Amino acid sequence: MPSQRIYTIRGQNGSATQHRKIQLSSYDANAQYQIVEFKIMPSGTPTNSDQYGIITMGKNDNVDPSSPDFSDQNQIAWAHHTVRQPVPPGIAESVVISNYEVNDEKMFAYDLWLHTEDVMGGKDVNWFLKIMRYSVGDVPASIASLRQYQYNPTE
């Protein structure tokens, strides 16, 4: 029976557009990774845009997200979700990206790119991402550079 571990990554985006890099420093080609949930919780009043945020995940071989040359055209996007109005401030909308297991080294060997876009008129957007890692046999399910959080669905 494969072991499993869930990582929850929380963040806050207060700028117009922000790119975040999550380093999978102990990637295991014999394991499977699955994005199980992404949730955005707006903390301000929405603008006239039709969305609160966008998440796009993929592997970028060429451009660092901190570079001004970074664009989604450089990404291989394999998961995408848009949070739309109306979502009252403080109420979270969640998405479960189910049955999407990644064990292709070319797609997932090095980095997971998390892109959140704040269209809240300068307001903060709180988000968290849950990554479930299935290990094979007794291989430790550890991703060294990810901070682990206790998942509280009421937050």
Regions found by a protein language model. Give the residues of each.
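C-terminal interaction-tip segments
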Residues: 1-16, 30, 44, 119-155
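Extended, solvent-exposed segments with strong compositional bias
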Residues: 4, 61-107
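Beta-rich globular "head" domains
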Residues: 5, 17-70, 75-77, 128-132
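Ser/Thr- (and often Asn-) enriched beta-sheet segments in non-cytosolic proteins
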Residues: 6-8, 54-56, 96, 113
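Short secondary-structure capping micro-motifs at structural edges
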Residues: 22-26, 98-102, 113-117
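Noncatalytic modules at the cell exterior or secretory-pathway interfaces
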Residues: 31-40, 104-122
